[in-house]
Regions:
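Soluble non-cytosolic domains of exported or imported proteins
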Residues: 56, 82, 90, 97, ...
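A broadly tuned preference for mixed-charge, low-complexity surface segments
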Residues: 78, 100-109, 150-153, 171, ...
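A short beta-strand structural signal in non-transmembrane regions
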Residues: 144-150, 158, 162
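Conserved hydrophobic/amphipathic secondary-structure segments
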Residues: 1-147
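An extracytoplasmic/periplasmic, membrane-proximal ligand-sensing/linker region
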Residues: 67-71, 155-215
Length: 215
């Protein structure tokens, strides 16, 4: 397998940002984000938090939250976000770290409630859900989708791709689709996109090291 770094590509633009969400059951004993880590501090290791598998983005989000609030949850890995959410619905774990779109339907039914999202601002469709930053926790983590080209791509080709992507990102049909899927329309130009890649690379490198994960 070829190793690939963000430095090996030329960023064109980021199209969205899909932050981590922290949902628990609708009948869970904690009502706010502050209640959740407090329960773990009271009984270390008792609070079971599901994730989508070792080294996955939602596992890293889970670990980043632990690091920021100074608690240790009992991590329960699953083979993806969907089985983690099913385990939460079944009462087998106390909370999960997943994307908002994976729990939106269960939130509207009242089966689950989302305590917070790891984003810079509140999400469309989740307007009542606070961000971690609103709660004094400086953490914004999730996944994103964007356009990049091979590093040796000629500048004139990059210019064409940049303009086409900018126009496409401004189309109502794309914005509506991302909002409908709770996937957070968040266009960013090439410079901002590269900064995001660089920041995430460093954050994830540190988390992977702390977790002792190896390829």
């Amino acid at each position: 397998m070829t190793e690939l770094s963000y430095e090996d590509v030329t960023p064109i633009a980021r199209l969205n940002f899909d932050p981590a969400a922290i949902p628990d059951r609708g009948d869970a004993p904690w009502e706010t984000l502050e209640d959740f880590p407090a329960a773990s501090r009271a009984k270390p290791g008792d609070v079971k938090m599901g994730n989508s598998g070792p080294g996955s983005i939602w596992h890293l989000a889970h670990a980043a939250l632990e690091d920021k609030v100074g608690v240790k949850f009992n991590p329960i890995p699953f083979g993806g976000a969907a089985p983690a959410v099913l385990a939460l619905l079944g009462g087998h774990v106390d909370a999960v770290a997943v994307s908002p779109d994976e729990v939106a339907i269960h939130g509207s039914s009242g089966k689950l409630k989302t305590l917070a999202v790891m984003a810079d601002r509140r999400l469309k469709g989740f307007e009542k859900v606070p961000t971690l930053k609103e709660r004094g926790i400086d953490l914004s983590i999730g996944t994103w989708r964007g356009i990049a080209a091979p590093k040796a791509t000629p500048p004139d080709v990059i210019a064409v791709l940049t303009e086409a992507t900018r126009k496409s990102a401004d189309e109502a049909v794309l914005k509506d689709a991302l909002d409908r899927l709770s996937m957070g329309h968040a266009y960013a130009d090439a410079a901002t996109f590269r900064d995001t890649m660089k920041r995430d690379n460093e954050v994830f490198r540190q988390l992977v090291g702390k977790l002792g994960l190896k390829a």
